[in-house]
Curated annotation (Swiss-Prot):
Gene of this entry: ALMT6
Annotated GO biological process: malate transmembrane transport; monoatomic ion transmembrane transport
Record GO cellular component, one term: vacuolar membrane
Keyword Plastid found: no
Taxonomic classification: Eukaryota, Viridiplantae, Streptophyta, Embryophyta, Tracheophyta
Transmembrane regions: 40-60, 70-90, 96-116, 123-143, 153-173, 179-199
UniProt key word Cell membrane: no
Coiled coil, from the record: 357-410
Signal peptide range in chain numbering: none
Membership in a protein family: Belongs to the aromatic acid exporter (TC 2.A.85) family.
Protein name: Aluminum-activated malate transporter 6
Entry function: Malate transporter.
Species assigned in the record: Arabidopsis thaliana
Localization per record: Membrane
Length: 538
């Protein structure tokens, strides 16, 4: 009973663990769809497109001879149907180019091989080799990267038409029905993807760029507040040190903006193909300017990344020194985040900037910070060591001048002595070079000496190390302030990129608040007047 009971218990535990694992996976799948409902609609549309295309298989009466080729329609749906409309259009275009070009070329080569009779298979094999070599080599060119799928379809269609046509003896039917069912599958994908809950890549690109503004603004504001509150990391997370995904809100904010480059490029390639829809009313909507604007945001995010590095640094400024610049640092951070959020809101609403200058407040705050640094620059350096170093340098300069004067006098005396001795003994000319060498070593003696400081304990060493770290901590505060000023300077490029986008995309002008109030009041008065007329008649 004991071993049997133990085995039953282990079997029951394993079944419970398996059921828990299945439940967790189902829960994760439900959360995946709940976080973005478009994923559910995409899956439904994919199944619908496959079902519609599969109907062709059962239509044996009108297409009795072609039913065996209907699988190409299903394969086209599986391969071409993508998440967004733009991606589907790109895949469909590449498949059409590859199919048409390969089908036409294969029919021409098939006709040539039939005329050659005895060399038919030799010509087919040679042409397949050449097509594979040329297509594979050409798609490696950087300019051909967007058409890589077209090259794959070209090779597949070219080989199938030649090989299967040679076996059946009917090249034209193979090429024709393959092209026909590919058109049916691609058309099904486009109709379902465009007219049934469409998912637009351009809209995703628009939202991604707008969210980058908010992410960088949150990181900037959080970094400034954390620095002024003397927030320190006991141990910097390894994920931050290796630039991986982390839960730190200060880190994840600017990292998401920096890491969005590849996603923006792929969305841009798809958005260019999409027809006008929603607020994007033109075929030549400036999608590239959205990516350019996001690049300007990343340029600012790099500065925020360096500002966050000041918080992660091991050498930190003293809290009392931070409080001396608290008001100015806080204002620059708040005004900079305010500008980012305002531009991000304008991008999201597709509105122009207001009549006022958007950078006035943040630039004024940066100027006040710069003036505060100038007035209290003594807090950013070790004034005692600066004064002591200056006095020491002046004393050394005075001693060096006096020493050079003595050396010159001794040189003149030595020269007179040598000249007189040379007149008495001409063979003693070799001693002159030794005298010059000893004199040169005498002049360089001060430059060759190095202050000998022992780091093996002692109060003097501790005091020296303390002063070094104190000076470095003050420089940390200066670095933080200078990075904030640099961030403000980069905002001008960001505003210029937004104005270029708003001009090309024809953003609408913002509606003044007083106009909205007047319209609301007028509408209210008209409603009251209508109510009075209604009740007066009744």
């Amino acid at each position: 009973m004991g071993p049997f009971h133990q085995q039953s218990r282990e079997r029951l535990l394993s079944q419970n663990e398996y059921s828990d694992m299945c439940f967790r996976k189902i829960t994760n799948l439900c959360e995946l769809g709940h976080s973005d409902r478009r994923r559910i609609f995409f899956a439904v549309k994919m199944g619908m497109a496959l079902a519609l295309c599969s109907v062709v298989i059962f239509l044996k009466e009108p297409l009795h001879d072609a039913s065996k080729y209907s699988v190409w329609g299903i394969l086209t749906v599986v391969v071409v149907f993508e998440y967004s409309v733009g991606a589907t259009l790109v895949k469909g275009f590449n498949r059409a180019i590859g199919t048409v070009s390969a089908g036409g070329l294969a029919l021409g080569i098939a006709r040539l091989s039939v005329l050659s009779r005895d060399f038919e298979q030799t010509i087919i094999i040679t042409c397949i080799f050449l097509a594979g070599f040329i297509a594979s080599y050409s798609k490696l060119h950087p300019a051909m990267k967007p058409y890589e799928y077209a090259f794959r379809v070209f090779l597949l269609t070219f080989c199938i038409v030649l090989v299967s046509g040679n076996n059946t003896g009917d090249f034209f039917s193979t090429a024709y029905y393959r092209f026909l069912f590919i058109v049916v599958g691609a058309t099904t994908c486009l109709v379902v993807n465009i007219f049934i809950f469409p998912i637009w890549a351009g809209e995703d690109l628009h939202k991604l760029v707008a969210n980058n503004f908010k992410s960088v603004a949150n990181s900037l504001e959080g970094c400034v507040n954390g620095y002024l509150q003397c927030v320190e990391y006991e141990r910097v997370p390894s994920k931050i040190l290796t630039y991986q995904t982390s839960d730190d809100p200060l880190y994840s904010g600017y990292r998401s903006a920096i890491q969005s480059t590849n996603q923006e490029e792929s969305l841009l390639d798809f958005a260019i193909w999409e027809p006008p829809h929603g607020p994007y009313r033109t075929f030549n909507h400036p999608w590239k300017n959205y990516v350019k604007l996001s690049g300007a945001v990343r340029h600012c995010a790099f500065t925020v990344m360096a500002i966050h590095g000041c918080i992660l640094s091991e050498i930190q400024a003293a809290p009392e020194k931070r409080q001396a610049f608290r008001h100015e640092l806080q204002r620059v951070g708040n005004e900079g985040a305010k500008v980012l959020r305002l531009i991000g809101e304008k991008v999201e609403k597709m509105e122009n900037l207001g009549p006022g200058e958007i950078l006035n407040d943040v630039q004024r705050a940066a100027e006040e910070l710069q003036m505060k640094i100038d007035s209290k620059s003594y807090l950013l350096v070790n004034s005692e060591s600066w004064a002591a170093t200056k006095e020491k340098a002046e004393a050394e300069e005075y001693e060096e001048e006096a020493h050079e004067t003595k050396v010159i006098k001794s040189l003149s005396q030595i020269w007179d002595t040598n000249s007189s001795s040379n007149n008495q003994n001409p063979a003693s000319g070799n001693d002159e070079s030794q005298i010059w060498e000893s004199t040169e070593s005498m002049m360089l003696r001060n430059r060759e000496t190095w202050p000998s400081v022992s780091f093996i304990g002692g109060s003097v060493v501790n005091e020296t190390v303390y002063k070094v770290y104190e000076s470095a901590s003050s420089l940390s505060l200066a670095t933080f302030a200078s990075l904030l000023i640099e961030f403000v300077a980069r905002l001008e490029n960001l505003v210029n990129a937004f104005e270029e986008l708003s001009t090309k995309a024809d953003f609408r002008d913002p509606v003044p608040l007083n106009v909205v109030d007047q319209e609301g009041l007028w509408t209210t008065l008209m409603r009251l007047r209508r109510l009075r007329r209604y009740f007066g008649r009744s």
